[in-house]
Amino acid sequence: YLPEEFPAEQWDLVMKINLDHVWFMIQRSLQVMLKQPTGGKIITIGSMASYFGCTTVPAYTATKGAVAQLTKSVAVDCAGRGININCICPGYMDTEMCANMTQERKDECTKRIPAGRWGLPEDMKGPVVFLASAASDYLNGALIPVDGGYLVK
């Protein structure tokens, strides 16, 4: 949709799913983790849209930018309390979400990815395992792009 045509009910739905539910998950997780002697790790999912505006998807772009900033805000509030929160930001992924893209558009996007391919859901495993492990204990409030180098080009 163009911004002037974006339906209000669609906006509300995307906000609920992509932002409100993330916030409530963080809140509930903190309520449990703050009672644990070991604290915990929270991993949010942003998008490359957390870094820049995307055409025809204003609600999606707004929510992913908000998730990135929410992650940073909570990281500041939880620093020193034994809880780390970081955000993984996938680039173009071969998932259902992009299934309706034309092949021409997919090819156009692929040309901008230095890795020369779209990500696969399996490409998210490494960052998730790292962020959930003790190896990331000093990492807090970070946005981790998983995008085949898209953002550096």
Tell what function each PLM region has:
Residues Y1-P3, P7-D12, C98, C109:
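Substrate-binding pocket helix/loop in short-chain dehydrogenase/reductase
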Residues E4, F52-P58, G80-R81, G116, ...:
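Active-site loop immediately N-terminal to the catalytic Tyr-X3-Lys motif
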Residues A79, N84, L139-G141:
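Short, small/polar-rich loop/turn modules that mediate ligand/substrate recognition or access, typified
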